[in-house]
Amino acid sequence: MGTDELRAAAGLFARLLAADAIPWRGVLGGVRITEEDTTSSSRIFLKVMFQEMAEQLGVRVLGRRMNDDDESEVRDALFPGDNAENTRFAINFFTAIGLGGVTEPARRMLSLL
C-alpha cells in the first residue's frame, strides 16, 4: 500500500472513530505504539488517523477519549505501561505529531515507572 492509500485509509478510520461509527476498543485496543510493534508505514497511518481525529474532535476531547477509564484497553495499548522505554516511545510519537496534549496521563504514569 502506498502513502496515498495509507492516508486515505487512515482518514476513513479517523472519520469512523470520531463519529463513534466503529468501536474504539475494537480498532485501537490492539494497537501498541512501541518501536517493536510499529513500522514506518503503520506510524504514518497512525499519525494521519490521530491528526485527523484531533481536527474533528479537538485535542482535548481526543485526549479524554484516549485516556478514558471506560476505554482502559485503548489507553493501555496506546501508552504501554510495561516499561519506561515503551511508554516514552508512545509519548514521543504523539508529541512529534503535534498531539503532546493527549500524553499527560502517560507522562504521570512514566514518572511512576
Question: What does each of the following model-derived ranges do?
Answer:
Residues M1-L113:
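Eukaryotic alpha-helical solenoid repeat scaffolds
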